Amino acid sequence: MLSRQERKRKVKVQFLGAHNCESATTRLVSILVDDILALDAGGLTSSLPIESQLDLKAVLLTHHHYDHIRDIPALGMNALFYETSVSVYATQAVRDALASHWLNGIIYVNFLEKPPESPRIQFTVIEPNRAFTVAGYEILPVPVNHSAPTVGYQVTAPDGKTLFYTGDTGPGLAEAWPFTSPQLLITEVTAPNRFEEFGRRMLHLTPSLLKEELLAFQKQKGYLPQVVLVHMNPRQEKEIDAEVKQLSSELGTSITLAYEGMVIQL
């Protein structure tokens, strides 16, 4: 049984990067849970001081596209200099992509294997729909629909509070709903509604496509979670924001755009 203090504890969710393009004011997607679990690595080293990087217990990667894995080499180099290692969890497809294209000894040092006696990236291959535990948090990888093999992660804190981060996804996200029941849903909206055909073709969401998935969630689960959106195109963000506000009003639930530095207490 949880103590009273544990029941009152808040789960901290910090958005280090919230966009699909990087600039002086926007970063690629990375989300930090309770300062120790990182969801994707688009904006980790550019956002966190070394001390905070060393506090990470795990980096969970959804898929192998550049904007989600970019900082893995830099994390490996920092781990080398500070004589430690970083634990990375992802599918075999992600490991293969890192090893062949990114940490291949040509673009950057292969920290998956070097130094031989103690590789700086300790990589654990995960299986979709097979839960595992990191630092007391239960992690469930759930397949989602995207142009590369992708899993979202349901993260359940020791006190039972739950979030689900989809990573990049398009129409068909409802196939994940039977496996997850979050209080907080972190998903993507890449473009405004006028790009719906693009979203269907490239497997990304617009507000109108998100609406279809949320209605399916509500039908299956009987409720709607708090929703926070990432992976926005900065050029179209004002248009996306207006459409998301309308969607939030229509569905009667909190749906907001994330921003760099945003913190939610769950």
What are these regions (language model features)?
Residues 38-42, 57-67, 89-91, 164-169, ...:
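Active-site neighborhood of phospho(di)ester-bond hydrolases with catalytic His/Asp-centered motifs
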Residues 8-52, 151-167:
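Conserved beta-strand hairpin/beta-sheet module of binuclear metal-dependent hydrolase folds
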Residues 48-53, 132-135, 175-178:
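Short amphipathic alpha-helix with an adjacent loop that forms part of the alpha/beta core around
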Residues 94-150, 157-158, 254-264:
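Metallo-beta-lactamase
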Residues 45-90:
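Active-site metal-binding motif and surrounding structural segment of the metallo-beta-lactamase
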Residues 78-84, 107-114, 214-224:
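Alpha-helix termini
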Residues 171-261:
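Cap/insert and terminal regions of metallo-dependent hydrolase folds
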Residues 13, 31, 39, 63, ...:
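Divalent metal-coordination and catalytic microenvironments
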